Structure formats: C-alpha cells, structure tokens
C-alpha cells in the first residue's frame, strides 16, 4: 500500500507522506484530507499514507476553498448579528494579532510594490472601497485599510453616530432610509434588522449572553466581549506620557489622558454639564428624556437607564449578594449597602 496514492490510488514514483511534519504547512496533509472529506485519517489505519503531487495540489486547493468559505461565513454572521462596522473592526483586530514582525516586513515590501504599480500584471484580489487601491494579499489589504481608520471620523448627518470608515457610514445611512419593520416590545423603537432589535432588547431584559472565560464578565454583544478579551493580553502598546499606565487600545489611552488634562469635550445639549467620556454623556442625556423605556418584568416600574433597571431587579432576587465589610449584614442592592455603611458605620 505504500506505493499507492491514498486519494486517486495511482502508482507514482514521487509520492509524499501525508503525515510528514517537515513540510511548510500549518496543518498536515492528513488533516487537510480529513477536514475536506469528513473521513478519519490516522497513522496505522491500514490505508496508504502516501499522496501523489497532483492530488496534493488538489487537496491544498480544496482546503483553501474550505477555509475561505468558513472565514466568509463567520464574517457575514457578524455583519448579520452586529452590523458591518463592528464586524469589519473585529476582522481588522484579529488580523492585527496574527501578523508577526516578519510578516510585517513582507507586507511593507508588498505594499511598496503595489503603490509603485509594479504588480499590475498579477491577479488583484482585494480592492479598497475607500480609495480604490488594489492589493493581491489579504494581509496587505487589511494593513492598508487601517490607514483609513487612524484619526478619522465620519459623522452621520441624521444622528450623532461617528464612523471610522466612509463605507461603514454609507451602510449606516441606509438604516435611516430603509423600512424598519422590527419593533421593540418594550419601548416601541423600530429597527431595520432583526439582529439589531435582538441586541437592543437585551438592554431591557438585562440579558448578557457573552461571557469572558477569564474573568466571568458578561456582555450584550459578542463584539464587546472580543474587545474586552484583549485587555487580558500581555501586549499593552499604548503608553501614557504623563504616568506609567499602559493600555491595549488607543481609545482607552485617550479617555485616561483626559484625567490628566481635565478636558471634558462631550457637552450636554440640554444642560451645562460636560463629560470626559462619550459614554458618560450618552448615559446622562437619557435623564433628559421624558420616556422611561426600561420596564421591569417583575413589577410595573420603569426606568430611563438600563443600569438602573438592572440594579432594581436585585430587589426581586431573594439572594443578598452585597456584604458589609464592617459587620455581618447582607443587602440585595449596592446602594442599600452604601446607605447602611453611612448610617451605621460612619
């Protein structure tokens, strides 16, 4: 059986062992065959462990198509569940983790060749929708796409959202013009996509299905979990020039830096208050809204903020999770514990 190709059963003098670990592939030929066919492939199974050159090329091609289809399917699922901007940003972040220093050097060379127009004769696989530059390699293309994201902001003329890419702004603007058939049963807001409605409804129900395996924190969206997971990594490339703190994202560094400068650029349009962080302004702005869209599922109470609803729901929970550090008392809510400490232990 050693002289026969496992795939086509041809007899050839140039057969290659499918378990050969010396070949420059991230997965063995045996694993490629198993993934493409669904058959179990293992040493000593009494089948031939050899493959001919033509079948080897066919297996690599089939495996490549399978990988591409899987990656594309995952990306489209993210677009469906999270929107195009979060999906694209997640793709860029993941590629950034995978590119090594050696890969960076090769990408730089490839980028220079692309920019000089020396590679026009070769097949173009990726075209930038921002500036229409063309690239042959996915890594080069994604590296170029990041240049459009550095320091740029494209505001939506219909709402206050900002986007790092013009193409994601265009996709977002369609939501203002498109029909919004999906209505929230809690606050009557409508959405163009069912996935957006599902994410929104979690702000009412308090559901946070995406859990970090390292610290047990939970999140409403999978994109929020992915960003959080990066905080557990050892790499913290963004360093504060005023102190020794480091951060995994430039966004977090910018927020922290305002604690040194005292800058509060996010101003409320309803009152004189200003905030250092955009999310704090967003949370504050809801206090000016007349409606109280967050309704408790256990009683008739309604709230302006989802965080207030989450805190309130603890009242309906029999478990008392907040323990006083000074005595043996337990409380259902953090604010009740705080009141106890001020009144009894002050």
UniProtKB/Swiss-Prot annotation:
Zinc finger extent (C2H2-type): 126-148, 154-176, 182-204, 210-232, 238-260, 266-288, 294-316, 322-345
Deleted gene: phenotype: RNAi-mediated knockdown in dopamine neurons increases dopaminergic mRNA levels of srl and its downstream transcription factors ewg and TFAM, and also results in a significant increase in mean lifespan (64 days) compared to controls (60 days). However, it has no effect on mitochondrial abundance, neuronal survival or climbing performance. Double knockdown with park or Pink1 in the dopamine neurons, improves climbing performance defects and rescues decreased mRNA levels of srl, ewg and TFAM in the single park or Pink1 mutants.
Entry binding sites for Zn(2+): 5, 8, 52, 55
An example Gene Ontology CC term for this record: nucleus
UniProt keyword annotations, A-Z: Metal-binding, Phosphoprotein, Repeat, Transcription, Transcription regulation, Ubl conjugation, Zinc, Zinc-finger
PTM note: Phosphorylated by Pink1 leading to ubiquitination by park. Ubiquitinated by park. Polyubiquitination by park leads to degradation by the proteasome which likely activates mitochondrial biogenesis to maintain neuron health and function.
Assembly and oligomerization: Interacts with park.
Protein purpose: Transcription repressor that inhibits transcription of srl/PGC-1-alpha to negatively regulate mitochondrial biogenesis and thereby promotes neurodegeneration. In neurons, functions downstream of the Pink1-park pathway and is likely to act as part of the Pink1-park homeostatic mechanism that maintains mitochondrial quality and function through degradation (mitophagy) and synthesis (biogenesis).
Protein name as annotated: Zinc finger protein Paris
Organism encoding this protein: Drosophila melanogaster (Fruit fly)
């Amino acid at each position: 059986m050693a002289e026969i190709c496992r795939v086509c059963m041809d007899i050839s003098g140039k057969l290659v062992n499918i378990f050969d670990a010396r070949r420059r592939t991230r997965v063995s030929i045996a694993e490629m065959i198993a993934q493409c066919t669904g058959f179990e492939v293992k040493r000593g199974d009494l089948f031939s462990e050899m493959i001919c050159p033509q079948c080897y090329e066919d297996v690599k091609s089939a495996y490549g198509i399978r990988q591409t289809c899987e990656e594309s399917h995952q990306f489209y699922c993210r677009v469906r569940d999270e929107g195009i901007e979060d999906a694209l940003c997640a793709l860029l972040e993941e590629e950034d983790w995978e590119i090594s220093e050696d890969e960076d050097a090769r990408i730089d060379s490839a980028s220079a060749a692309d920019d000089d127009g020396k590679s026009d004769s070769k097949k173009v696989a990726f075209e930038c929708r921002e500036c229409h530059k063309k690239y042959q390699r996915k890594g080069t293309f994604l590296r170029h796409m990041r240049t459009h994201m550095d320091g740029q902001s494209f505001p939506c003329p219909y709402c206050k959202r900002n986007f790092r890419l013009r193409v994601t702004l265009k996709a977002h603007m369609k939501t203002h013009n498109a029909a919004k058939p999906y209505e929230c049963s809690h606050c009557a807001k409508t959405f163009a996509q069912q996935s957006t409605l599902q994410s929104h409804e979690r702000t009412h129900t308090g559901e946070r299905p995406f859990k970090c395996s390292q610290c047990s924190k939970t999140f409403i969206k999978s994109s929020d979990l992915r960003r959080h997971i990066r905080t557990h990594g050892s790499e913290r490339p963004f360093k504060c020039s005023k102190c020794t703190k480091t951060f995994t994202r430039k966004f977090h560094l910018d927020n922290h830096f305002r604690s040194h400068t005292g800058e509060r650029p996010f101003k409320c349009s309803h009152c004189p208050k200003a905030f250092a962080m955009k999310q704090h302004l967003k949370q504050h702005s809801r206090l000016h809204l007349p409606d109280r869209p967050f309704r408790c599922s256990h009683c008739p109470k309604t709230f302006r903020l989802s965080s207030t609803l989450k805190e309130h729901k603890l009242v309906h929970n029999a478990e008392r999770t907040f323990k006083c550090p000074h005595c043996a008392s337990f409380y259902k809510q953090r604010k009740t514990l705080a009141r106890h400490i001020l009144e009894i232990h002050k």
